[in-house]
UniProtKB/Swiss-Prot annotation:
Family note: Belongs to the UPF0297 family.
S-S bonds: none
Pfam families with a match to the protein in the record: IreB
Entries under NCBIfam families matching the protein: PRK05473.1 (NF003997)
Source organism of this protein record: Staphylococcus aureus (strain NCTC 8325 / PS 47)
Protein's name in the database: UPF0297 protein SAOUHSC_01721
Length: 86
């Protein structure tokens, strides 16, 4: 039986931070150009994994699907915390 009192380490194969940022910026711009609330759409995608939240325009859907959602969330949380602790 496993001990659930121990902290598990989450590890993943890192993508270059700039690649994740470039994709998120492209997705954001594309959603904004289409008149969507970009933050709501990205959150919807991250929570559900449903690519229908992201348009195909500018290859936004293809790009974001090539990055694991955990990697995107890690980048967003990391960036937010670094900005808050400057």
């Amino acid at each position: 039986m496993e001990n659930f009192d121990k902290t598990m380490k989450f590890d993943y194969e890192e993508l270059p931070t700039q690649d994740v940022r470039d994709v998120l910026n492209n997705v954001y711009r594309t959603l904004d150009e289409r008149g969507y609330n970009a933050v709501n759409q990205i959150v919807g995608y991250l929570l559900s994994g449903d690519p229908a939240y992201i348009p195909r325009q500018n290859e936004a859907r293809n790009q974001i699907r090539h990055i694991d959602r955990d990697v995107i969330m890690e980048e967003l949380v990391s960036y937010y915390l670094k900005e808050q602790n400057k």
